[in-house]
Every structure is written in C-alpha cells, then in structure tokens.
C-alpha cells in the first residue's frame, strides 16, 4: 500500500529530485519513514529559507514540537549539550537542550519568535552566547553519515539540505490529524495533494545517496 501511494509522486529518484527542487525554492516537503518504525510523516523546511508563515503551519498542522536538525559540528559550535546523558528512548533521537534566541524575541513561543531563534542558531559565526536555554525550539543532532547511519527523520532532513546545496540545517514537525492522532501515509498523501507538496521516504534518500555524494 505504501509504495502504491508514494508512486503517484514519481519513482524513488524522482521523488528525491522533486523534493530537492522544492527545498531550493523555499518550499516544504513531507518525509515519511517505514511502517515498522515510527510510521509517521514530518513537515520539512530548510532553516535557510524558513519563514514565520511556514513555522505557523508546522505549529498548526503538526505536533507543535518543532525541531531544528543540525550537524554534529554545528551542535558542537553552539555548545549544546544533549538533553540527557543516557538516551534510552526507543529510536535514540538526538535531542539537545532546547533553545531560544537571546535577542529579538518576547516569550519565544510565537511563530515569529521561533523563526528568529532558528535564524540566530544557524547564522554564520553563531556562538553559544547568541542563545538561551531552555527555549521553545528543539535542536536535534544528526548522525555524521546521515540516513546511512540511522534511518531517522533527523538524518533525512539534514541529508536533504546537503543534497539541495543549502545550509545543512532543517526544520521538522510531525504531521497530525485534526483529532490529535498521528497522520499515517493515506492522510499524509492527502495533506500533500491539497497543498501541492512533494512526499518522499527516508528509504528514497538512502537509495539516492548510493549514487550521489554529499
């Protein structure tokens, strides 16, 4: 069922290439994982092109937990410690301590404030002192070799940004249904079609990377 739904967006290579083009144009995509993993779809946007309107969409249509996916190098530059020293969560998601921009925000929770926090974190030359902790944006540390190390949305997001030629930082938020349950592939595809968004899978990225260097 999953492949038949995804096939309407092209084959694996086409899905990746269409998604890369959308990201370069400042648009969002939907990234799904396997049915035997989280079986979820995440709204993905580039941090480089992020707007407050896109942040608001993630907050409104998603879980509300907006995460900033970063390379390990960037996390180290910002001196962001992991949220816990012993990560025993089911999928080992690399949460760091949450962040807020030191300047240019009020309570930090609005779409505009969260966008400002993202921009502060990814700015060239950004340092730890540009941020406060805790905050309302949740950084995630991606594995160094991306989806080839871990088939996670975090790694998929950073890989997409690298393949797009964008700054290697992206936003994700899990898509939810109106009743608060997690959206599954049929709902994810329906959401994408209504908003003319591209859908691809983490496995698509893994296959694509076999023939394309980051």
Curated annotation (Swiss-Prot):
Alphabetical UniProt keywords: Lyase, Magnesium, Manganese, Metal-binding, Riboflavin biosynthesis
Site positions (Essential for catalytic activity): 136, 174
Binding site for Mg(2+) 1: 38
Annotated positions binding D-ribulose 5-phosphate: 37-38, 42, 150-154, 174
EC number: 4.1.99.12
Binding site for Mg(2+) 2: 38, 153
Metal-binding keyword on record: yes
UniProt signal peptide: none
Record-level GO BP terms: riboflavin biosynthetic process
PANTHER family reported for this sequence: 3,4-DIHYDROXY-2-BUTANONE 4-PHOSPHATE SYNTHASE (PTHR21327:SF38), GTP CYCLOHYDROLASE II-RELATED (PTHR21327)
Subunit note: Homodimer.
Protein name per UniProt: 3,4-dihydroxy-2-butanone 4-phosphate synthase
Gene expressing this chain: ribB
